[in-house]
């Protein structure tokens, strides 16, 4: 029995390492394996179970799960960081990013602001970056209300049937904006140049390719995880899901490289860079590793816990991110799960400007 447990523990450690470092795989070369980062919560949990088992059954073997967890410390911290609480200093900039799902949760009575709108207006953010925003044009439209509050705004629609796009509300002048050229019918990234007290800052707002999974497919996946589906059906649906995930990941990879090239260009120009938005990918992914090269993940540096930002069945991870260059020090990053008017939760943090001498 003990030998079986040891073997099972070793397999759990191997799975943790393979999943944890799967962000090294390029999606075009490894389309199916590059998605295993989605399993990170499951493999962490499995290794924690062995930690508890050895404490109870055989403390002398406690070193085995501890060694596995230490070997995977970096990806575990990427997935679920823990940081001491630090108050943001006076003058730090607050940035909020949110996929608002075309404001589908925006419901108002005559003359009344919705919960979604109150949240945005009360956020007191210096920068609000929205994805899947729509400009409805009526007197209570979200973007019109934000334009009343913020001196500088820009809405860049996507040329598609939905008419949604990316939006930036800023307390500081927006000098220019430039869409990053990659082919996609429903996704886009925009490079905004903002003047913050004489310092030019690049803010890249992103809505990258999704996995393309429908609500029903997410619910089916949730039932599979719970063991509520017959084995044959579960196998077929799982294979179909893996195929769909692979296609979405491969398409996203091409977009990611275009955005990463723009980030590196801006860094070479000596500009402070913030890249944020709906990356549609987890902290354990090619997307995250490629985009965060030369940048700091604000949530990993100053947030706590897994920070699940997509709130529908089956996806238990953070797919919305804020990255910054070393011109900034991040504080208090948080995924705010108190508001449920979109299929994403907003993510925000404070950024202290620290110009180089």
Which residue ranges define each predicted feature?
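Acidic/histidine-rich helix-loop elements
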Residues: 97-113, 212-249
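Structured beta-strand-rich core segments of catalytic domains in phosphoester-bond hydrolases
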Residues: 65, 69-91, 107-108, 117, ...
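N-terminal targeting/secretion presequences
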Residues: 59-60
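Metal-dependent phosphoester-hydrolase catalytic domains
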Residues: 2-16, 21-54, 63-67, 178-180, ...
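Short, solvent-exposed loop/turn segments at secondary-structure junctions
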Residues: 101-103, 135, 172-174, 208-211, ...
């Amino acid at each position: 029995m003990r030998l079986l447990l040891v073997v099972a523990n070793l397999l759990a450690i191997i799975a943790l390492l393979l999943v944890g470092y799967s962000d090294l795989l390029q999606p075009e070369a490894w389309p199916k394996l590059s998605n295993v980062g989605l399993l990170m919560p499951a493999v962490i949990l499995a290794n924690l179970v062995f930690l508890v088992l050895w404490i109870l059954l055989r403390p002398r073997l406690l070193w085995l799960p501890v060694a596995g967890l230490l070997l995977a410390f970096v990806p575990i911290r990427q997935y679920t960081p823990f940081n001491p609480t630090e108050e943001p200093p006076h003058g730090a900039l607050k940035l909020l990013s949110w996929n608002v799902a075309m404001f589908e949760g925006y419901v108002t009575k005559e003359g009344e602001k919705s919960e979604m709108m109150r949240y945005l207006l009360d956020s007191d953010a210096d920068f609000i970056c929205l994805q899947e925003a729509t400009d409805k044009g009526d007197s209570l439209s979200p973007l019109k209300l934000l334009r009343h509050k913020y001196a500088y705004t820009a809405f860049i629609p996507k040329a598609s049937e939905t008419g949604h796009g990316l939006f930036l509300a800023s307390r500081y002048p927006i000098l220019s904006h430039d869409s990053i050229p990659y082919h996609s019918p429903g996704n886009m990234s925009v490079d905004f140049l903002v003047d913050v007290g004489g310092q030019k800052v690049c803010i890249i707002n992103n809505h990258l390719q999704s996995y393309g999974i429908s609500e029903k497919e997410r619910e089916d996946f949730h039932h599979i995880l719970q063991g509520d589906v017959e084995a044959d059906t579960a196998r077929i649906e799982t294979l179909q899901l893996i195929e769909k995930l692979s296609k979405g990941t491969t398409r996203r990879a091409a977009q990611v490289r275009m955005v990463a090239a723009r980030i590196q260009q801006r860094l070479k120009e000596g500009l402070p860079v913030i890249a944020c938005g709906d990356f549609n990918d987890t902290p354990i992914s090619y997307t995250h590793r490629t985009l965060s090269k030369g940048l700091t993940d604000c949530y990993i540096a100053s947030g706590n816990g897994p920070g699940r930002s997509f709130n529908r069945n089956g996806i238990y991870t953070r797919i919305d991110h804020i990255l910054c260059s070393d011109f900034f020090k991040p504080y208090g990053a948080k995924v705010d799960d108190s508001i449920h008017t979109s299929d994403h939760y907003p993510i925000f943090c404070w950024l202290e400007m620290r110009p180089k001498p």
